[in-house]
Amino acid sequence: MNTKEIVNKYEFKFNKNLGQNFLIDESVLEDIIEGAEISKEDTVIEIGPGVGTLTKELLERAKEVYSIELDGDLIPILQEELKEYNNFTLIHKDALKINFNELMENKDSIKLVANLPYYVTTPIISRLLTEKCDFKSLTIMIQKEVAERINAEPNCKEYGSLTVLVQYYCNTKIIRKVSPNSFIPKPKVDSIVIKLDRLSEPRVRVKSQKLFFNVVRSSFNMRRKTLWNSLKSLNIDKESMENAFERAGIDPKRRGETLSIEEFGKLSDCIYDIL
């Protein structure tokens, strides 16, 4: 059965508070599966399985699938629809409260697939990356504007701290755009399927990741300010900051959105050296 048929079969009522929009376009499902590159060696962690339409396709291809679902009304539907699969584990929990490192422990070749409510997208991605969860890739349906921020390059308005965070740890690839007509109920925004391939090592080697991300966040907190003014929040004396900018070869009159990840790394290392 397709998504609409399962929804009608169980007379499922959508929960607006959970931001539920279920994918009904089978061509998008196929592109997610193809883009995620799932094989029998892979353990898949799926966040937001809905009524299990995509989950079935994952179960056919993966070694095992762990699906995380918050809505208690969907649990019996998923249990019934997927009862024939012995490689399926359903976790009834808020993904924001999951210990992903614990879930991924002693599992090989972990790939994540997610169709999340848009309000939890950034927190989930941030946690998976900053907590150094051991996964190979994340294929995710997200709001178009968020995908554009993740995939941005310097010198554009979309480029920001989220861009740097994701691209520090991952290569990014947009798989396809998805219109509101591909969902029930229809969301008010366009969506994009994007894949994040985890790098074996961070894109740049820095002396302190904590300082690196502090510099990045401070640089984007007030986008229209120069780096010199933005980085005053670090509470470093004027002479030391002048020295750090000079050693990094970066003009303090530039704005954060003009710096590449490599330049952020160079600047944070020079600041680290003077602390």
From Swiss-Prot:
Broad class of the protein's primary localization: cytoplasm
Residues holding S-adenosyl-L-methionine: N21, L23, G48, E69, D94, N115
An annotated GO cellular component: cytosol
One example GO MF annotation: RNA binding
EC main group: transferase
Location of the protein in the cell: Cytoplasm
Domain of life per record: Bacteria
Swiss-Prot/TrEMBL keywords: Cytoplasm, Methyltransferase, RNA-binding, rRNA processing, S-adenosyl-L-methionine, Transferase
Keyword Transferase: yes
EC number: 2.1.1.182
Catalytic activity of the protein: adenosine(1518)/adenosine(1519) in 16S rRNA + 4 S-adenosyl-L-methionine = N(6)-dimethyladenosine(1518)/N(6)-dimethyladenosine(1519) in 16S rRNA + 4 S-adenosyl-L-homocysteine + 4 H(+)
Residues making up the signal peptide according to the UniProt record: none
InterPro entries named in the record: KsgA/Erm, rRNA_Ade_diMease-like_C, rRNA_Ade_Mease_Trfase_CS, rRNA_Ade_methylase_Trfase_N, rRNA_adenine_dimethylase, SAM-dependent_MTases_sf
SUPFAM superfamilies, per database record: S-adenosyl-L-methionine-dependent methyltransferases
Similarity field: Belongs to the class I-like SAM-binding methyltransferase superfamily. rRNA adenine N(6)-methyltransferase family. RsmA subfamily.
Function: Specifically dimethylates two adjacent adenosines (A1518 and A1519) in the loop of a conserved hairpin near the 3'-end of 16S rRNA in the 30S particle. May play a critical role in biogenesis of 30S subunits.
Entry protein name: Ribosomal RNA small subunit methyltransferase A
Gene designation per UniProt: rsmA
